[in-house]
């Protein structure tokens, strides 16, 4: 089980990312537009730097929904490898079976 403070920090970052997502998308579209002039891009870059650090989606960490484990998380299920195996062995995930060859 991960520390609750770390899990809560990640949730706080997720809220910040969602809060600034639209504003960030507008600024990034100005920066990526080939037709915009240099002054507009410079001002957009300044606006992007003024946003909070945690508004960047890169700072989010994918964690297990049950335990908060940061590594070995399957994005399709949102679970860590250990919990995924436990739940799959109980047959609670439809269509997921143990491989045998």
UniProtKB/Swiss-Prot annotation:
The keyword Aminoacyl-tRNA synthetase does not apply. GO terms for cellular component: cytoplasm; small ribosomal subunit. It comes from the Bacteria. GO terms for molecular function: rRNA binding; structural constituent of ribosome. Keywords: Ribonucleoprotein, Ribosomal protein, RNA-binding, rRNA-binding. One of its GO terms (biological process) is translation. It holds the Pfam family Ribosomal_S14. InterPro entries: Ribosomal_uS14 (IPR001209), Ribosomal_uS14_bac/plastid (IPR023036). Belongs to the universal ribosomal protein uS14 family. Binds 16S rRNA, required for the assembly of 30S particles and may also be responsible for determining the conformation of the 16S rRNA at the A site. Part of the 30S ribosomal subunit. Contacts proteins S3 and S10. This is Small ribosomal subunit protein uS14. It comes from Nitrosomonas europaea (strain ATCC 19718 / CIP 103999 / KCTC 2705 / NBRC 14298).
């Amino acid at each position: 089980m991960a520390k609750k403070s770390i899990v809560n920090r990640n949730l706080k970052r997720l809220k910040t990312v969602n809060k600034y997502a639209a504003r960030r998308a507008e600024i990034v579209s100005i920066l990526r537009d080939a037709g915009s002039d240099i002054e507009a891009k410079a001002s957009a870059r300044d606006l992007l730097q003024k946003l909070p650090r945690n508004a960047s989606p890169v700072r989010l960490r994918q964690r297990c929904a049950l335990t908060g484990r940061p590594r070995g998380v399957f994005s399709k299920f949102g679970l860590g490898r250990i919990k995924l195996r436990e739940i799959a062995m109980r047959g609670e995930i439809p269509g997921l079976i143990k491989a045998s060859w």
